[in-house]
């Protein structure tokens, strides 16, 4: 047998075996998976029907209320629209079941027998033709050896059989390739029909939802404004905030939806609320009484949520910080979040707004200034930012002579206290009569050597005195304290006044290396 004919035969048999051993089993598995898909969709459709029916009932309840009729109408319309889309989707599933799965299952059963018979017929026919051709070639060889006069006719017969054999193997291979292509085309055309049905469904759904969603959004946003049915007594003054003055914690449902861009940031996800940032009116009410947080040892998402929900009337930022709001600190070193997304990442020099009044086990919770990132960070990584002290006589106007950002008022680096147990800040912050504190300072400066100097950054002025005492001694004490502090800043004392340096008489001996103590190296 010629090598090219044998190659054609092997290729044809490989195609038939591929259809029988790979394509048909894969098609059977596809039918099985499609039936599972149908069952899952029917379960999903039933669950969706129950869900949107429940939404419709809630909307009908809202229609009966006096404040949420518009929202109830929106819920009913949403439920009807989704149920209508669900019924349209069932048409797509029916197409998938009737035009695809049933045909594939039926064709698979028929095709398995057809391909098996075709393969057997081809194999038998090929062997019969090959045996006949081999027999004629043997007879021709015998006649040529005997010089038979019929050898020419036998040779013509062999050539004719060889041509027929070659045409048969070529045609059989083309038929096998065509059968293989028809099966893949059948699968592609059926799924193309399914995709077209999905496209029609999505087009109808888009046309149905495009205008309705915009209308629902406008009506929902309009419902955020106070209702005309409410009396002014319930909402407070006509020009006041939209929330009553007694409401300290706005509900999460009143907050606008979170922008889509915030879902990509893990830190903003942990730092924001469940429903997004608070609106302006809710923020003004919530600042009346901030959090009193009880935190665990290690910050976590649960502790963050717990700290944002616990409130206390007796302990707020306004009472702890004198109404000044959250304090600001500056980062000394960089801090990375690592694998814990509840930690705050910042670089050295960044300013962080502390949202927790006191450190909890060495951790502070704050928000990075200039961004929406918030989280936990070690207290040792930051230092307080110099604040502008407030004049006790006029709490609104700051003291210009104590501005911390002025280079003339900043003390040199050697002005840190070395041996003193108190500083100027301790004396200024001591409660009581400012005159008594100034007299104590005068006596201390005269009786002792000025070995202690004020710290680099002057601390804020002491809290205002009660109204009965502030009227009598406020101006005198404040003026005395300011003068003392200005004199210390302009003429700081020497680090070691003459005769007070304990190391002035110390003389160091020259060191000598004892080479005999070195190891012996051979």
From Swiss-Prot:
PROSITE patterns linked to this entry: IMD (PS51338), SH3 (PS50002)
Residue stretches making up the SH3 domain: 324-387
GO cellular component assignments: cell-cell contact zone; clathrin complex; cytoplasmic vesicle membrane; plasma membrane; vesicle membrane
CDD domains: I-BAR_IMD_BAIAP2L2, SH3_BAIAP2L2
Membrane-spanning intervals of the chain: none
Compositional bias segments (type: Low complexity): 443-456
Coiled coil regions in record: none
Domains (record comment): The IMD domain consisting of an antiparallel dimer of three-helix bundles, featuring on one side a positively charged. The N-terminal alpha-helix inserts into the lipid bilayer. Also forms homodimers and homooligomers. The residue Trp-141 is essential for oligomer formation.
PANTHER family in the cross-refs: BRAIN-SPECIFIC ANGIOGENESIS INHIBITOR 1-ASSOCIATED PROTEIN 2, BRAIN-SPECIFIC ANGIOGENESIS INHIBITOR 1-ASSOCIATED PROTEIN 2-LIKE PROTEIN 2
Protein name stated in the entry: BAR/IMD domain-containing adapter protein 2-like 2
Gene field: Baiap2l2
């Amino acid at each position: 047998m010629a090598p090219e004919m044998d190659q054609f035969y092997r290729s044809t048999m490989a195609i038939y075996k591929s259809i029988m051993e790979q394509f048909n089993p894969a098609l059977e598995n596809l039918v099985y998976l499609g039936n599972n898909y149908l069952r899952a969709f029917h379960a999903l459709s039933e669950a969706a029907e129950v869900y949107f029916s429940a939404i419709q009932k809630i909307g009908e309840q809202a229609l009966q209320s006096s404040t949420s009729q518009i929202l109830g109408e929106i819920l009913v319309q949403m439920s009807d629209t989704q149920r209508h889309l669900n019924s349209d989707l069932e048409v797509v599933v029916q197409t998938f079941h009737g035009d695809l799965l049933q045909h594939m299952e039926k064709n698979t059963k028929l095709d398995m027998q057809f391909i098996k018979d075709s393969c057997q017929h081809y194999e038998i026919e090929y062997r019969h033709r090959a045996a006949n051709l081999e027999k004629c070639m043997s007879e021709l060889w015998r006649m040529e050896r005997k010089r038979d006069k019929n050898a020419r006719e036998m040779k013509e017969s062999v050539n004719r059989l060889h041509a027929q054999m070659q045409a048969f193997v070529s045609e059989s291979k083309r038929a096998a390739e065509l059968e293989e292509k028809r099966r893949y085309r059948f699968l592609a055309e059926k799924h193309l029909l399914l995709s077209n049905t999905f496209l029609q469904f999505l087009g109808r759904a888009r046309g149905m939802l495009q205008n309705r969603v915009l209308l629902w959004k406008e009506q929902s946003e309009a419902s955020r404004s106070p209702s005309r049915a409410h009396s002014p007594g319930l909402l407070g003054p006509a020009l006041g905030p939209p929330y009553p003055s007694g409401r300290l914690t706005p509900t999460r449902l009143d907050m606008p939806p979170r922008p889509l861009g915030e879902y990509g940031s893990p830190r903003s996800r942990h730092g924001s609320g469940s429903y997004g940032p608070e609106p302006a009116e809710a923020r003004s009410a919530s600042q009346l009484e901030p959090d009193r947080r009880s935190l665990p040892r290690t910050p976590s998402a649960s502790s963050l949520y717990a700290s944002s929900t616990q409130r206390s009337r007796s302990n707020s930022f306004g009472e702890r910080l004198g109404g000044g709001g959250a304090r600001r600190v500056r980062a000394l070193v960089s801090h990375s979040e690592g694998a814990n997304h509840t930690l705050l990442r910042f670089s050295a020099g960044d300013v962080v707004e502390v949202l927790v009044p006191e450190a909890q086990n060495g951790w502070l919770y704050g928000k990075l200034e200039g961004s929406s990132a918030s989280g936990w960070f070690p207290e040792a990584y930051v230092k307080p930012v110099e604040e502008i002290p407030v004049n006790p006589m006029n709490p609104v106007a700051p003291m210009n002579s104590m501005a911390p950002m002025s280079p003339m008022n900043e003390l040199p680096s050697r002005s840190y206290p070395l041996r003193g147990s108190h500083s100027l800040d301790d004396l200024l912050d001591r409660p009581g009569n400012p005159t008594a504190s100034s007299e104590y300072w005068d006596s201390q400066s005269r009786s002792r050597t000025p070995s202690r100097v004020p710290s680099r950054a002057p601390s804020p002025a002491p809290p205002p005195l009660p109204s009965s005492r502030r009227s009598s001694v406020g101006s005198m004490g404040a003026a005395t304290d300011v003068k003392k502090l200005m004199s210390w800043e302009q003429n700081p004392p020497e680090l070691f006044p003459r005769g007070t340096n304990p190391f002035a008489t110390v003389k160091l001996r020259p060191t000598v290396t004892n080479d005999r103590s070195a190891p012996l190296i051979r």
